[in-house]
Protein backbone atom coordinates (compact mmCIF):
# COMPACT_ATOMS: atom_id res chain seq x y z
CA UNK A 1 0.00 0.00 0.00
CA UNK A 2 2.86 2.38 0.71
CA UNK A 3 4.14 1.79 -2.83
CA UNK A 4 0.71 2.66 -4.18
CA UNK A 5 0.67 5.91 -2.19
CA UNK A 6 4.15 6.76 -3.41
CA UNK A 7 3.02 6.28 -7.00
CA UNK A 8 0.14 8.67 -6.43
CA UNK A 9 2.46 11.23 -4.84
CA UNK A 10 4.93 10.98 -7.70
CA UNK A 11 2.18 11.68 -10.23
CA UNK A 12 0.81 14.73 -8.44
CA UNK A 13 -0.54 16.48 -5.42
CA UNK A 14 -4.07 15.40 -4.46
CA UNK A 15 -7.76 15.30 -5.28
CA UNK A 16 -8.84 18.68 -3.98
CA UNK A 17 -8.66 20.32 -7.41
CA UNK A 18 -11.05 17.76 -8.88
CA UNK A 19 -13.83 18.68 -6.44
CA UNK A 20 -13.43 22.40 -6.02
CA UNK A 21 -16.61 23.76 -7.65
CA UNK A 22 -20.23 22.67 -8.07
CA UNK A 23 -21.15 21.62 -11.59
CA UNK A 24 -23.01 24.76 -12.65
CA UNK A 25 -20.99 27.37 -10.73
CA UNK A 26 -21.04 30.65 -12.63
CA UNK A 27 -23.10 29.37 -15.57
CA UNK A 28 -25.53 31.88 -17.06
CA UNK A 29 -28.84 30.83 -18.53
CA UNK A 30 -28.99 30.28 -22.25
CA UNK A 31 -30.73 33.12 -24.12
CA UNK A 32 -31.65 32.40 -27.73
CA UNK A 33 -34.18 35.19 -28.47
CA UNK A 34 -36.79 32.62 -29.51
CA UNK A 35 -34.38 30.87 -31.87
CA UNK A 36 -33.96 27.09 -31.66
CA UNK A 37 -30.31 26.05 -31.76
CA UNK A 38 -29.67 22.80 -33.64
CA UNK A 39 -27.21 20.21 -32.33
CA UNK A 40 -26.29 17.35 -34.67
CA UNK A 41 -25.47 14.03 -33.02
CA UNK A 42 -23.81 11.05 -34.74
CA UNK A 43 -24.70 7.71 -33.16
CA UNK A 44 -23.05 4.36 -34.01
CA UNK A 45 -24.14 0.88 -32.94
CA UNK A 46 -22.34 -1.75 -30.86
CA UNK A 47 -22.79 -5.49 -30.63
CA UNK A 48 -20.19 -5.76 -27.84
CA UNK A 49 -21.90 -3.21 -25.61
CA UNK A 50 -25.40 -2.66 -27.09
CA UNK A 51 -26.37 -0.19 -24.37
CA UNK A 52 -23.50 2.21 -25.04
CA UNK A 53 -25.14 4.27 -27.86
CA UNK A 54 -28.30 4.75 -25.79
CA UNK A 55 -26.31 5.53 -22.65
CA UNK A 56 -24.44 8.27 -24.48
CA UNK A 57 -27.63 9.82 -25.86
CA UNK A 58 -29.41 9.62 -22.48
CA UNK A 59 -26.43 11.23 -20.79
CA UNK A 60 -26.15 13.93 -23.45
CA UNK A 61 -29.82 14.86 -23.15
CA UNK A 62 -29.52 15.05 -19.37
CA UNK A 63 -26.42 17.23 -19.58
CA UNK A 64 -27.65 19.69 -22.19
CA UNK A 65 -31.14 20.10 -20.71
CA UNK A 66 -30.00 22.66 -18.15
CA UNK A 67 -32.83 25.01 -17.15
CA UNK A 68 -35.15 22.87 -19.32
CA UNK A 69 -33.47 24.00 -22.54
CA UNK A 70 -34.88 21.04 -24.52
CA UNK A 71 -38.38 21.37 -23.14
CA UNK A 72 -38.37 25.11 -23.84
CA UNK A 73 -37.25 24.34 -27.41
CA UNK A 74 -34.15 26.47 -27.03
CA UNK A 75 -32.17 23.46 -28.25
CA UNK A 76 -33.08 20.71 -30.71
CA UNK A 77 -31.03 17.50 -31.02
CA UNK A 78 -30.95 15.96 -34.51
CA UNK A 79 -29.60 12.40 -34.47
CA UNK A 80 -28.09 10.53 -37.42
CA UNK A 81 -27.21 6.83 -37.28
CA UNK A 82 -23.79 5.88 -38.68
CA UNK A 83 -23.80 2.07 -38.41
CA UNK A 84 -20.42 1.01 -37.08
CA UNK A 85 -18.91 4.40 -37.82
CA UNK A 86 -17.59 3.61 -41.30
CA UNK A 87 -16.11 6.49 -43.33
CA UNK A 88 -18.87 6.41 -45.97
CA UNK A 89 -21.85 6.45 -43.59
CA UNK A 90 -20.20 8.93 -41.26
CA UNK A 91 -19.35 11.35 -44.06
CA UNK A 92 -22.88 11.14 -45.47
CA UNK A 93 -24.41 11.77 -42.05
CA UNK A 94 -22.08 14.67 -41.31
CA UNK A 95 -22.85 16.31 -44.67
CA UNK A 96 -26.59 15.94 -44.06
CA UNK A 97 -26.37 17.58 -40.65
CA UNK A 98 -24.12 20.37 -41.89
CA UNK A 99 -25.71 21.21 -45.24
CA UNK A 100 -29.35 20.07 -44.97
CA UNK A 101 -30.10 20.54 -41.28
CA UNK A 102 -27.71 23.49 -40.89
CA UNK A 103 -26.78 22.52 -37.35
CA UNK A 104 -24.99 25.03 -35.14
CA UNK A 105 -22.75 22.40 -33.51
CA UNK A 106 -22.07 18.69 -33.92
CA UNK A 107 -21.10 15.95 -31.54
CA UNK A 108 -21.36 12.17 -31.23
CA UNK A 109 -19.33 8.99 -31.07
CA UNK A 110 -16.95 8.59 -33.98
CA UNK A 111 -13.50 7.13 -34.53
CA UNK A 112 -10.67 9.65 -34.65
CA UNK A 113 -9.24 8.12 -37.83
CA UNK A 114 -12.62 8.44 -39.56
CA UNK A 115 -12.95 12.09 -38.56
CA UNK A 116 -9.62 12.80 -40.23
CA UNK A 117 -11.12 11.75 -43.58
CA UNK A 118 -13.62 14.63 -43.66
CA UNK A 119 -12.36 17.03 -41.00
CA UNK A 120 -12.07 19.83 -43.56
CA UNK A 121 -15.89 20.02 -43.73
CA UNK A 122 -16.07 21.61 -40.29
CA UNK A 123 -13.52 24.25 -41.15
CA UNK A 124 -15.26 25.03 -44.44
CA UNK A 125 -18.67 25.27 -42.79
CA UNK A 126 -17.27 26.85 -39.58
CA UNK A 127 -19.22 24.48 -37.34
CA UNK A 128 -17.57 23.05 -34.19
CA UNK A 129 -17.55 19.27 -33.80
CA UNK A 130 -17.01 17.68 -30.38
CA UNK A 131 -15.77 14.18 -31.22
CA UNK A 132 -16.37 11.56 -28.53
CA UNK A 133 -14.99 8.02 -28.35
CA UNK A 134 -13.16 5.68 -25.94
CA UNK A 135 -9.85 7.36 -26.79
CA UNK A 136 -8.33 4.58 -28.86
CA UNK A 137 -6.17 6.74 -31.16
CA UNK A 138 -3.51 9.41 -30.79
CA UNK A 139 -4.51 12.80 -32.29
CA UNK A 140 -2.40 13.39 -35.40
CA UNK A 141 -1.28 16.93 -36.18
CA UNK A 142 -3.93 17.89 -38.81
CA UNK A 143 -6.66 17.13 -36.25
CA UNK A 144 -4.90 19.07 -33.52
CA UNK A 145 -4.56 22.09 -35.79
CA UNK A 146 -8.21 22.24 -36.90
CA UNK A 147 -9.80 25.10 -34.89
CA UNK A 148 -13.30 23.61 -35.17
CA UNK A 149 -12.47 20.12 -33.87
CA UNK A 150 -12.67 19.22 -30.19
CA UNK A 151 -12.10 15.78 -28.70
CA UNK A 152 -13.64 14.48 -25.49
CA UNK A 153 -12.69 10.84 -24.91
CA UNK A 154 -12.27 8.15 -22.25
CA UNK A 155 -8.47 8.27 -22.70
CA UNK A 156 -7.88 4.59 -23.53
CA UNK A 157 -4.35 4.88 -24.91
CA UNK A 158 -3.27 7.24 -22.11
CA UNK A 159 -4.71 4.71 -19.65
CA UNK A 160 -2.63 1.94 -21.23
CA UNK A 161 0.52 4.06 -21.06
CA UNK A 162 0.01 4.94 -17.38
CA UNK A 163 -0.90 1.34 -16.48
CA UNK A 164 2.37 0.12 -17.95
CA UNK A 165 4.37 2.61 -15.91
CA UNK A 166 2.44 1.66 -12.78
CA UNK A 167 2.79 -2.09 -13.32
CA UNK A 168 6.50 -1.87 -14.14
CA UNK A 169 7.31 0.18 -11.05
CA UNK A 170 5.14 -1.92 -8.72
CA UNK A 171 5.27 -5.52 -9.92
CA UNK A 172 8.42 -5.95 -11.98
CA UNK A 173 10.05 -5.23 -15.29
CA UNK A 174 8.64 -8.17 -17.26
CA UNK A 175 5.09 -7.87 -18.55
CA UNK A 176 2.84 -9.93 -20.80
CA UNK A 177 0.08 -8.35 -22.89
CA UNK A 178 -2.81 -10.66 -23.74
CA UNK A 179 -4.93 -9.18 -26.51
CA UNK A 180 -6.86 -10.10 -29.67
CA UNK A 181 -6.64 -9.15 -33.32
CA UNK A 182 -9.47 -6.68 -32.79
CA UNK A 183 -8.36 -5.17 -29.48
CA UNK A 184 -4.77 -4.78 -30.68
CA UNK A 185 -5.84 -2.80 -33.75
CA UNK A 186 -5.58 0.59 -32.04
CA UNK A 187 -2.89 2.59 -30.23
CA UNK A 188 -3.24 0.97 -26.79
CA UNK A 189 -0.67 -1.79 -27.42
CA UNK A 190 1.99 0.69 -28.50
CA UNK A 191 1.15 2.99 -25.59
CA UNK A 192 1.48 0.16 -23.06
CA UNK A 193 4.72 -1.14 -24.56
CA UNK A 194 6.21 2.35 -24.67
CA UNK A 195 5.13 3.08 -21.10
CA UNK A 196 6.92 -0.05 -19.89
CA UNK A 197 10.04 0.85 -21.87
CA UNK A 198 10.16 4.26 -20.21
CA UNK A 199 10.49 2.44 -16.88
CA UNK A 200 13.14 0.10 -18.34
CA UNK A 201 10.65 -2.74 -18.60
CA UNK A 202 9.94 -5.25 -21.35
CA UNK A 203 6.71 -6.71 -22.69
CA UNK A 204 5.66 -9.66 -24.81
CA UNK A 205 2.37 -9.86 -26.69
CA UNK A 206 0.06 -12.87 -26.99
CA UNK A 207 -2.78 -12.52 -29.50
CA UNK A 208 -5.91 -14.59 -28.88
CA UNK A 209 -7.80 -15.78 -31.95
CA UNK A 210 -11.55 -15.28 -31.78
CA UNK A 211 -13.47 -18.48 -32.46
CA UNK A 212 -10.49 -20.79 -31.84
CA UNK A 213 -11.34 -23.29 -29.11
CA UNK A 214 -7.91 -23.57 -27.51
CA UNK A 215 -6.73 -19.98 -27.90
CA UNK A 216 -7.13 -19.12 -24.19
CA UNK A 217 -5.40 -22.38 -23.23
CA UNK A 218 -2.45 -21.37 -25.40
CA UNK A 219 -2.29 -17.98 -23.69
CA UNK A 220 -2.33 -19.58 -20.24
CA UNK A 221 0.44 -21.94 -21.32
CA UNK A 222 2.46 -18.96 -22.53
CA UNK A 223 2.03 -17.26 -19.16
CA UNK A 224 3.34 -20.35 -17.38
CA UNK A 225 6.34 -20.66 -19.68
CA UNK A 226 7.39 -16.99 -19.68
CA UNK A 227 6.72 -16.31 -15.97
CA UNK A 228 5.96 -12.58 -16.30
CA UNK A 229 5.74 -10.25 -13.31
CA UNK A 230 2.27 -9.11 -14.35
CA UNK A 231 -0.33 -9.57 -17.11
CA UNK A 232 -2.21 -6.85 -18.99
CA UNK A 233 -5.52 -8.05 -20.48
CA UNK A 234 -6.25 -5.76 -23.43
CA UNK A 235 -9.44 -7.61 -24.30
CA UNK A 236 -13.16 -6.97 -24.65
CA UNK A 237 -16.43 -8.89 -24.75
CA UNK A 238 -16.67 -12.67 -24.40
CA UNK A 239 -12.96 -13.20 -24.96
CA UNK A 240 -12.12 -10.90 -22.05
CA UNK A 241 -14.61 -12.70 -19.85
CA UNK A 242 -13.31 -16.18 -20.74
CA UNK A 243 -9.67 -15.23 -20.28
CA UNK A 244 -10.16 -13.56 -16.91
CA UNK A 245 -12.32 -16.39 -15.55
CA UNK A 246 -9.87 -19.07 -16.62
CA UNK A 247 -6.81 -17.06 -15.58
CA UNK A 248 -8.24 -16.72 -12.09
CA UNK A 249 -9.96 -20.07 -11.64
CA UNK A 250 -7.97 -22.66 -13.60
CA UNK A 251 -4.55 -21.26 -12.88
CA UNK A 252 -5.40 -19.96 -9.41
CA UNK A 253 -2.93 -17.28 -10.42
CA UNK A 254 -1.67 -14.74 -7.92
CA UNK A 255 -0.03 -12.78 -10.74
CA UNK A 256 -1.07 -9.11 -10.80
CA UNK A 257 -3.70 -8.60 -13.49
CA UNK A 258 -4.21 -5.24 -15.20
CA UNK A 259 -7.07 -4.64 -17.65
CA UNK A 260 -8.79 -1.94 -19.68
CA UNK A 261 -11.09 0.47 -17.81
CA UNK A 262 -14.14 -1.15 -19.39
CA UNK A 263 -13.69 -4.22 -17.21
CA UNK A 264 -14.91 -2.05 -14.32
CA UNK A 265 -18.33 -1.53 -15.92
CA UNK A 266 -21.10 -2.93 -13.73
CA UNK A 267 -22.66 -5.13 -16.41
CA UNK A 268 -19.27 -6.76 -17.03
CA UNK A 269 -18.35 -7.23 -13.37
CA UNK A 270 -21.57 -9.13 -12.69
CA UNK A 271 -20.49 -11.79 -15.21
CA UNK A 272 -17.06 -12.16 -13.61
CA UNK A 273 -18.23 -12.39 -10.01
CA UNK A 274 -15.48 -13.00 -7.48
CA UNK A 275 -12.95 -13.55 -10.28
CA UNK A 276 -12.85 -9.79 -10.82
CA UNK A 277 -11.42 -9.10 -7.37
CA UNK A 278 -7.85 -7.86 -7.52
CA UNK A 279 -7.92 -6.54 -11.09
CA UNK A 280 -6.39 -3.09 -11.41
CA UNK A 281 -6.78 -0.46 -14.10
CA UNK A 282 -6.48 3.25 -14.67
CA UNK A 283 -9.92 4.55 -15.53
CA UNK A 284 -11.41 7.89 -16.61
CA UNK A 285 -14.35 7.65 -14.20
CA UNK A 286 -16.34 5.36 -11.92
CA UNK A 287 -19.82 5.84 -10.55
CA UNK A 288 -18.27 5.07 -7.16
CA UNK A 289 -16.34 8.35 -7.18
CA UNK A 290 -17.13 10.27 -4.03
CA UNK A 291 -17.26 13.89 -5.08
CA UNK A 292 -20.28 16.18 -5.55
CA UNK A 293 -20.37 16.50 -9.33
CA UNK A 294 -20.24 12.73 -9.81
CA UNK A 295 -22.73 11.99 -7.04
CA UNK A 296 -25.20 14.51 -8.47
CA UNK A 297 -24.85 13.06 -11.96
CA UNK A 298 -25.37 9.47 -10.79
CA UNK A 299 -28.44 10.51 -8.78
CA UNK A 300 -30.00 12.49 -11.63
CA UNK A 301 -29.25 9.80 -14.20
CA UNK A 302 -30.86 7.14 -12.02
CA UNK A 303 -33.94 9.27 -11.47
CA UNK A 304 -34.25 9.95 -15.20
CA UNK A 305 -33.48 6.51 -16.68
CA UNK A 306 -34.06 4.13 -13.73
CA UNK A 307 -30.61 2.64 -14.33
CA UNK A 308 -27.02 3.18 -13.25
CA UNK A 309 -24.82 5.23 -15.60
CA UNK A 310 -21.90 3.62 -17.41
CA UNK A 311 -18.84 5.38 -18.83
CA UNK A 312 -20.58 6.30 -22.08
CA UNK A 313 -23.45 7.84 -20.13
CA UNK A 314 -20.93 9.94 -18.22
CA UNK A 315 -19.19 10.95 -21.47
CA UNK A 316 -22.51 11.95 -23.01
CA UNK A 317 -23.55 13.92 -19.94
CA UNK A 318 -20.21 15.70 -19.74
CA UNK A 319 -20.42 16.61 -23.44
CA UNK A 320 -24.01 17.82 -23.08
CA UNK A 321 -23.15 19.94 -20.07
CA UNK A 322 -20.14 21.34 -21.90
CA UNK A 323 -22.30 22.18 -24.93
CA UNK A 324 -24.87 24.02 -22.84
CA UNK A 325 -22.21 26.04 -21.07
CA UNK A 326 -20.58 27.00 -24.37
CA UNK A 327 -23.91 28.07 -25.87
CA UNK A 328 -24.84 30.04 -22.77
CA UNK A 329 -21.53 31.90 -22.73
CA UNK A 330 -21.89 33.10 -26.35
CA UNK A 331 -24.23 35.95 -25.33
CA UNK A 332 -26.41 35.50 -28.38
CA UNK A 333 -23.60 35.20 -30.94
CA UNK A 334 -23.95 31.60 -32.09
CA UNK A 335 -21.60 31.81 -35.05
CA UNK A 336 -19.19 28.91 -35.42
CA UNK A 337 -16.24 31.10 -34.54
CA UNK A 338 -17.93 32.30 -31.35
CA UNK A 339 -18.90 28.76 -30.34
CA UNK A 340 -15.40 27.42 -31.03
CA UNK A 341 -13.93 30.19 -28.88
CA UNK A 342 -16.40 29.40 -26.07
CA UNK A 343 -15.46 25.72 -26.16
CA UNK A 344 -11.74 26.47 -26.17
CA UNK A 345 -12.16 28.68 -23.10
CA UNK A 346 -14.50 26.28 -21.27
CA UNK A 347 -13.69 25.40 -17.66
CA UNK A 348 -15.99 23.28 -15.53
CA UNK A 349 -16.24 20.54 -12.97
CA UNK A 350 -17.69 17.42 -14.58
CA UNK A 351 -18.45 14.03 -12.99
CA UNK A 352 -14.82 13.02 -13.45
CA UNK A 353 -13.32 16.25 -12.06
CA UNK A 354 -11.85 19.45 -13.46
CA UNK A 355 -12.47 19.70 -17.20
CA UNK A 356 -10.92 21.96 -19.82
CA UNK A 357 -9.72 21.81 -23.41
CA UNK A 358 -6.08 22.22 -24.27
CA UNK A 359 -6.23 25.55 -26.14
CA UNK A 360 -3.56 24.44 -28.62
CA UNK A 361 -5.08 21.09 -29.60
CA UNK A 362 -8.77 21.07 -28.66
CA UNK A 363 -8.32 17.87 -26.64
CA UNK A 364 -10.05 17.51 -23.29
CA UNK A 365 -7.92 17.51 -20.15
CA UNK A 366 -9.42 15.50 -17.30
CA UNK A 367 -8.26 13.46 -14.28
CA UNK A 368 -7.72 9.71 -14.34
CA UNK A 369 -8.13 7.20 -11.53
CA UNK A 370 -6.06 4.27 -10.33
CA UNK A 371 -8.85 1.75 -9.79
CA UNK A 372 -8.71 -1.57 -7.97
CA UNK A 373 -11.59 -4.03 -7.97
CA UNK A 374 -12.24 -5.37 -4.50
CA UNK A 375 -14.42 -8.21 -3.27
CA UNK A 376 -17.97 -7.15 -2.50
CA UNK A 377 -19.44 -7.31 0.97
CA UNK A 378 -21.18 -10.64 1.73
CA UNK A 379 -19.84 -12.10 -1.55
CA UNK A 380 -21.71 -9.58 -3.67
CA UNK A 381 -20.32 -8.38 -7.01
CA UNK A 382 -16.86 -6.84 -6.58
CA UNK A 383 -16.76 -3.05 -6.81
CA UNK A 384 -14.24 -0.60 -8.27
CA UNK A 385 -12.38 1.58 -5.77
CA UNK A 386 -10.86 4.62 -7.53
CA UNK A 387 -8.04 6.87 -6.34
CA UNK A 388 -7.28 10.02 -8.29
CA UNK A 389 -4.06 10.38 -10.26
CA UNK A 390 -3.56 14.11 -9.74
CA UNK A 391 -1.49 14.33 -12.92
CA UNK A 392 -2.63 12.59 -16.07
CA UNK A 393 -0.82 12.73 -19.40
CA UNK A 394 -1.78 14.98 -22.30
CA UNK A 395 -3.17 13.37 -25.45
CA UNK A 396 -0.37 14.95 -27.49
CA UNK A 397 2.46 14.32 -25.01
CA UNK A 398 5.92 13.85 -26.54
CA UNK A 399 5.87 10.28 -25.19
CA UNK A 400 3.55 9.47 -28.11
CA UNK A 401 5.52 11.31 -30.80
CA UNK A 402 6.09 8.11 -32.81
CA UNK A 403 2.33 7.90 -33.40
CA UNK A 404 2.18 11.36 -34.98
CA UNK A 405 2.36 10.18 -38.57
CA UNK A 406 -0.07 10.05 -41.51
CA UNK A 407 1.10 6.49 -42.27
CA UNK A 408 -1.24 4.76 -39.86
CA UNK A 409 -3.09 1.46 -39.90
CA UNK A 410 -5.76 -0.09 -37.74
CA UNK A 411 -9.52 -0.35 -37.29
CA UNK A 412 -11.65 2.66 -38.18
CA UNK A 413 -14.67 2.09 -35.95
CA UNK A 414 -14.63 3.54 -32.44
CA UNK A 415 -13.28 0.97 -30.00
CA UNK A 416 -16.05 -1.37 -28.75
CA UNK A 417 -18.48 -0.17 -31.44
CA UNK A 418 -18.37 -3.29 -33.58
Segments (PLM) and residue ranges:
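Signal peptide-proximal N-terminal region
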Residues: 57-79
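C-terminal segment of N-terminal export signals and the immediately downstream linker at the start
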Residues: 1, 23-44
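Extracytoplasmic "Venus flytrap"
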Residues: 40-59, 80-87, 185, 309-313
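Extracellular/periplasmic periplasmic-binding protein-like sensory domains
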Residues: 246-317, 329-330, 395-403, 407-415
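Extracellular/periplasmic bilobed ligand-binding domains
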Residues: 122, 189-282
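Extracytoplasmic ligand/sensor domains, especially the bilobed periplasmic-binding protein
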Residues: 104-206, 256-274
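Solvent-exposed, acidic/polar segments of extracytosolic/periplasmic ligand-binding ectodomains
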Residues: 351-418
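N-terminal export signals
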Residues: 6-27
Amino acid sequence: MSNRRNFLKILGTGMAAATANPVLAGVSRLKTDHRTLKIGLLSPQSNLFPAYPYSFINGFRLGIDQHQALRKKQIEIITEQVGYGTPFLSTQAARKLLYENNVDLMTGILGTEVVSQFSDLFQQKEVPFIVCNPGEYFPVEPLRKNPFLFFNTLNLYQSSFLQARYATTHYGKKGLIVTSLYDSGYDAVYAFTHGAEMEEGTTEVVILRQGTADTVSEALSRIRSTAPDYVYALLSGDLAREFILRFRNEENSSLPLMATPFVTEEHFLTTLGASAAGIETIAPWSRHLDHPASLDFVKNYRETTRSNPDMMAMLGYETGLLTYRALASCNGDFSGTSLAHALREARMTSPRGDFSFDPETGWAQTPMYLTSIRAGLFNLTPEPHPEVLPQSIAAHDLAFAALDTPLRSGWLNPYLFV
